[in-house]
């Protein structure tokens, strides 16, 4: 699947993002996803392959690698709880705002896309409720509240700061929802609980 990151530099008057919003990628990952989308369209158009094109916005949950935001913060909290790290969470940009979808909801969305969406077209998938947008700073604070270690400091570390930031990514998923009837069922609290518990178990079992 593609990614909401493909949109990159978005202005406030362009929110929420839709299928026709201009792409202004600001990192190599986003460019690679755009290339993937274009080549998939070529295979649909030229060779008749049954390809469903989607751009998925932030989805989180257990087993996501800790090079990403929420897993990285949860991983650090789990280490702090085990005494493996000082009570300081190291971060990059944390004022960027996103709305988050649980990976289980996203997997259901992918299945519905395959079953109900006409091939060749583009669909945005994600939680697009503007009342459920969180900055990464807010997410970290919610994770800290779930920890048995309360006096955890948040500290920006230059090595984790991207040279370019994407302040807000909010997608308009109306087209996809109308075709499939999909709605995300799992909220941010369960997303954070599931992610934090995964990393707690991981560290206990691996002495990481």
How would you name each of these model-derived features?
Residues 5-53, 58-60, 64-65:
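Catalytic helix-loop patch of NAD(P)-dependent Rossmann-fold dehydrogenases
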Residues 19-20, 47-50, 74-90, 116, ...:
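A short C-terminal helix-loop "cap" of Rossmann-like NAD(P)-dependent dehydrogenase/epimerase domains
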Residues 34, 59-75, 82-87, 103-104, ...:
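Glycine/proline-rich active-site loop of Rossmann-fold NAD(P)-dependent oxidoreductases
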Residues 88-93, 122-123, 137-140, 148-168:
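C-terminal "lid/loop" region of Rossmann-like NAD(P)-dependent oxidoreductases
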Residues 103, 122, 159-183, 187:
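Conserved C-terminal active-site "lid" loop/helix of NAD(P)H-dependent oxidoreductases
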Residues 106, 110, 125, 136-139, ...:
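Non-catalytic, hydrophobic alpha-helical segments
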Residues 188-208:
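Amphipathic terminal alpha-helices
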